[in-house]
Amino acid sequence: MIDYAAAGEWLEAYGRAWQTFDGDAWVGLFTEDAEYHEDPFGTPLVGHNALRAYLLEAAASETDVEFTVERHWTAGDTLLAAWHAGFARKPGGQHARLAGFLTAEIASDGRASRFREWTLQAPGTEG
């Protein structure tokens, strides 16, 4: 079971790892065999190697990342959050604005074993 404070700390660490593109911090948030569903209909990324590659891909195409949690909740072992993000695209600097919702199933060691997100892009922004 994850409590509200621990969920907030996990989300802060998630945002910080994305903003700094810290691969070790990023994969440290997930179990070794974690599933990361960027799209509810797509094939998930599975495991630390896939997660690190995903972050490296983001680092190659994004800069000036901002990540803000609007609100979060917990239900048993599940963390739920509404969030907003923005970043500039490399090259060119086109700005992207996103809003989303995520769920993370948190294992007993505090790492996510399954992560799902649903994302909307603001009209008129590059994504």
Regions found by a protein language model. Name each.
Residues 1, 6, 52-127:
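A beta-strand edge to alpha-helix "cap/lid" segment located at domain peripheries
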Residues 1-32, 126-127:
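Short, low-complexity N-terminal intrinsically disordered segments enriched in polar/charged residues
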Residues 14, 26-27, 34, 47, ...:
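Hydrophobic pocket/interface hotspot
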Residues 15, 40, 71-73:
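Structured beta->alpha junctions
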Residues 22, 34, 63-66:
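Secondary-structure boundary/capping signal
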Residues 33-34, 95:
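Short hydrophobic/aromatic segments of transmembrane alpha-helices and their interfaces
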Residues 35-45, 60:
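A short gly/proline-enriched turn/hairpin at secondary-structure junctions
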Residues 43-46, 50, 64:
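Generic, well-ordered alpha-helical segments
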